[in-house]
């Protein structure tokens, strides 16, 4: 194990990802238009450290308009590349594709940006935070081609 990785496990982004591990029951809100919640549901999530703490595997199950939604994300901090990276698949948004997202800043909040759709492509930003009461908040934002960012999904 490299010294850089050991340090990250003790006090860096890998440490933060380790803190997120657990089984959770939460609440998900979905916005289909700015400022208007289009659906709310209960969800169940499992976040677990895998491969010696190198990655965080996120599995979730919920519903949208009373239809089952399930998904998987892998969150990582790539020390050699100096990037935060995420691979995300689900039964609602991604169809049969994987959304890859990244951020070249590994020293702050876990926040990554990916893109989807045909030209002009839209952005999809995912942020993971832990509040002072140790609640995990995963928020996803749609970013229109012009750069306007709107909350799309939030799970607490």
Question: Where would I find each of the regions flagged by the language model?
Answer:
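Helix-adjacent hinge/juxtasegments
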Residues: 62-100
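Asp-box/WD-like beta-propeller blade repeats and closely related beta-sheet repeat scaffolds
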Residues: 108-116, 120-127
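Short beta-strand segments that buttress and anchor functional surface loops
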Residues: 58-63, 86-89, 111-117, 139-142
């Amino acid at each position: 194990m490299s010294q850089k990785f050991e340090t990250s496990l003790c006090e860096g982004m890998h440490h933060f990802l380790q803190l997120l591990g657990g089984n959770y029951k939460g609440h998900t809100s979905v916005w289909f238009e700015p400022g208007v919640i289009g659906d709310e549901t209960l969800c169940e999530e499992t976040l677990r450290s895998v491969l010696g703490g190198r990655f965080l595997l996120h599995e979730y199950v919920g519903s949208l308009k009373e239809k089952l939604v399930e998904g998987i994300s892998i969150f990582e901090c790539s020390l050699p590349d100096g990037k935060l990276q995420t691979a995300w698949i689900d039964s609602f948004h991604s169809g049969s594709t994987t959304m890859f997202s990244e951020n070249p800043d590994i020293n702050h909040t876990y926040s990554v940006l990916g893109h989807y759709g045909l030209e002009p492509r839209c952005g999809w930003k995912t942020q993971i935070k832990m509040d002072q009461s140790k609640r995990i908040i995963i928020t996803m934002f749609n970013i229109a081609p012009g750069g306007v960012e709107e909350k799309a999904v939030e799970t607490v």
